[in-house]
Amino acid sequence: MASLRLFSTNHQSLLLPSSLSQKTLISSPRFVNNPSRRSPIRSVLQFNRKPELAGETPRIVVITSGKGGVGKTTTTANVGLSLARYGFSVVAIDADLGLRNLDLLLGLENRVNYTCVEVINGDCRLDQALVRDKRWSNFELLCISKPRSKLPMGFGGKALEWLVDALKTRPEGSPDFIIIDCPAGIDAGFITAITPANEAVLVTTPDITALRDADRVTGLLECDGIRDIKMIVNRVRTDMIKGEDMMSVLDVQEMLGLSLLGVIPEDSEVIRSTNRGFPLVLNKPPTLAGLAFEQAAWRLVEQDSMKAVMVEEEPKKRGFFSFFGG
């Protein structure tokens, strides 16, 4: 029987074994001292080395989608916090004009007193607009505007570039990562958000409307000079793929032609974590979606990717990270 398997492009895979369940542990010898032991599922943060940062710093990454509601802001929160937990300094910029939500997902909404607008107008210093997460002091949030507010005339990509340059030259040092949460759509807000970026993470779901928008956004990113584009496929359900009611990850990859950074399973815990302002990657015990976000962050650090391939094998029980079709 043919099935779809996902592998890291690095020969030392980050993927979970095919026998994964909530009672088995991640058994890659790269990270686990004794892979034969059984224990509750563990976070990748318990592995025995820190990912090696590739590329020049700061890495300026825009997380975008085109279509709204595919999990772009959820991805920003979880990948950003995972990077901070790996030990890298991170500034996340919510570039959604008047409709910011990243502060809610991070549980920081009551601590945002100033935004980029006040910094640009000279009403506050940049360090006053940055909100430092109390859980991880190397993670900071910067909001572009207040909810339902309008940006001043002339605010655009150049202004955001100025803010990014200010982050690079601040007295306490440049962050390792600047993560920009891009608004949905392809209007002026999108153009503003992608202007300072030199790499992009495209979030999509395995449905035809999201993929058409993602394909359009890919073209716009390339026209803007962003060639390093990786993809996260979100809200994947293996039961629907096996029933041929949802496109497989391989189908998505073939349609968009992008490097695969991560595959995130459908997870009801996302709604609970959003309402609590407590990202999935902080859950104990971790969920499969939380682990998938952590692994995507690891690949982002090392500029690694996943590869979907068809293999022939005998029918057997399969886990989420090793089976995406039938």
From Swiss-Prot:
Assigned GO CC terms: chloroplast; chloroplast envelope; chloroplast inner membrane; chloroplast stroma
Effect of residue 296 to G: In arc11; loss of homodimerization, abnormal intraplastidic localization patterns, heterogeneous and reduced population of chloroplasts in mesophyll cells and petals, with normal and larger plastids, due to reduced chloroplast divisions and asymmetrically constricted chloroplasts, and highly elongated and multiple-arrayed chloroplasts in developing green tissues
Membrane topology reported for the UniProt record: Peripheral membrane protein
GO molecular function: ATP binding; ATP hydrolysis activity; calcium-dependent ATPase activity; identical protein binding; protein homodimerization activity
Superkingdom to which the source organism belongs: Eukaryota
Subcellular location(s) of the protein: Plastid, Chloroplast inner membrane
Regulation: Stimulated ATPase activity by MINE1.
Keywords: ATP-binding, Chloroplast, Membrane, Nucleotide-binding, Plastid, Plastid inner membrane, Transit peptide
InterPro entries hit by this protein: CobQ/CobB/MinD/ParA_Nub-bd_dom, MinD, P-loop_NTPase, ParA/MinD_ATPase
Organelle targeting sequence: 1-62
Binding site for ATP: 67-74
Disruption phenotype: Heterogeneous population of chloroplasts in mesophyll cells and petals, with normal and larger plastids, due to reduced chloroplast divisions and asymmetrically constricted chloroplasts. Contains highly elongated and multiple-arrayed chloroplasts in developing green tissues. Formation of some FtsZ rings that fail to initiate or progress the membrane constriction of developing chloroplasts. Normal shape and number of etioplasts in cotyledons.
Assembly, per entry: Homodimer. Interacts with MINE1. Binds to ARC3. Interacts with MCD1. Interacts with CDP1/PARC6.
Biological function: Together with ARC3 and MCD1, regulates FtsZ ring positioning in chloroplasts in an ARC6-dependent manner. Calcium-dependent ATPase required for the correct placement of the plastid division site. Inhibits FtsZ filament and ring formation in the plastid. Mediates inhibition of plastid division. In cooperation with MINE1, prevents FtsZ ring formation anywhere outside of the mid-plastids.
Protein known as: Septum site-determining protein minD homolog, chloroplastic
Induction text: Accumulates during seed germination, at the beginning of rapid greening.
Any one Pfam family match given in the protein's UniProt record, by short name: CbiA
Family assignment from sequence similarity: Belongs to the ParA family. MinD subfamily.
UniProt cross-references to Gene3D superfamilies, sorted A to Z: P-loop containing nucleotide triphosphate hydrolases (3.40.50.300)
Gene Ontology biological-process entries: chloroplast fission
pH-activity profile: Optimum pH is 7.5-8. Active from pH 7 to 9.
